[in-house]
Amino acid sequence: MSMQDPIADMLTRIRNGQAANKVAVTMPSSKLKVAIANLLKEEGFIEDFKIEGDTKPVLELVLKYFQGKAVVESIQRISRPGLRIYKKKDALPKVMAGLGIAVISTSKGVMTDRAARQAGLGGEIICYVA
């Protein structure tokens, strides 16, 4: 059976992995998942990520903890296959008054809400991370 929402699966694996104090989580890889993982690493929400395998690539995320607590407090899917959420550049949300990030898929690639505002781009709101 095929997976309906691979991005929601990725976010759930991160949430469950940190709840269980796992060092790393693995999942099937895709270009969008790698772009999201790269953003999470740049923003300091995960330690690192790597892609393994050629025929069926697997994405491994190394989770980050601070003083025994997970760095990611909440991770929430916003736009989903059944209900896509798009926002214009002036309507992009601020997550936790700027402490968290919104991952936005724009015409120039996947970026944070801050970067999209600076570039003057709107797009699909993939998820919130705080």
UniProtKB/Swiss-Prot annotation:
This is Small ribosomal subunit protein uS8. Part of the 30S ribosomal subunit. Contacts proteins S5 and S12. GO terms for molecular function: rRNA binding; structural constituent of ribosome. It comes from Serratia proteamaculans (strain 568). Keywords: Ribonucleoprotein, Ribosomal protein, RNA-binding, rRNA-binding. One of its GO terms (cellular component) is ribonucleoprotein complex. One of the primary rRNA binding proteins, it binds directly to 16S rRNA central domain where it helps coordinate assembly of the platform of the 30S subunit. PANTHER family: 40S RIBOSOMAL PROTEIN S15A. Belongs to the universal ribosomal protein uS8 family. One of its GO terms (biological process) is translation.
